[in-house]
Swiss-Prot record:
The RxLR-dEER motif acts to carry the protein into the host cell cytoplasm through binding to cell surface phosphatidylinositol-3-phosphate. It comes from the Eukaryota. Keywords: Coiled coil, Host cell membrane, Host membrane, Membrane, Secreted, Signal, Virulence. Effector that might be involved in host plant infection. Belongs to the RxLR effector family. This is RxLR effector protein PITG_00582. Induction: Expression is induced during host plant infection.
Amino acid sequence: MLPYKTLLLALGFFFTVQCHFFASASSFDIADNNQNGVRLLRSPEKTDEERGAVDALKSELSFMKLNWAARSKITPKEKLVAKQAKEMSNTKEKLSKIEAKLQAKAVKAEQKVKDQAIKAEQNLKAKNEKAAQQLKALQQNELEKLAKQAAKDDKMYNRWLMAEMTPDDVYKKFKFKELAKKGIYPTTSVNYKHYKNYRTIYYARYPKLLEKLDA
């Protein structure tokens, strides 16, 4: 069965020929009215425009017939091969698109991991810097506390010196003997450091007393 386009062209060709026939018939001359029959005179020649239209339709029809004949001569095997080739081409195209999408996703995921690693490193660095600052502040506060405590202890030791208290007097004031009787060593007391510090200061101020003590 001819394609729809072929039918349309054939109808157009038929319509053109028919119109040309009617136009030619109207120009026929009647040669002799007295004779029994009517003799038609030779029709005038076709114009260039008419010949061009007819030739164009004939050419188009010839091409369509040839194409149709070529298609009709294709074997089932050739059709199957062509179909498989088309399906293979479509499959390759789909696979290429999928591969491109996967590569794009992989690149995006890799960049995301890199960004997260950089961000984590920056956060860790910031935390370390903050911790170092806090430690430095704590150490500074501790040093300030120690300095204040040392100044306070010095004033206390000076008062003991002004009161002419000996290290033995300080030892008695802290009641280390009573602690020893209870089984508590004086060295475990928080006040023992004051005794030791004052003893050092006292004998540094009165070295002769230390010589007598050693003697």
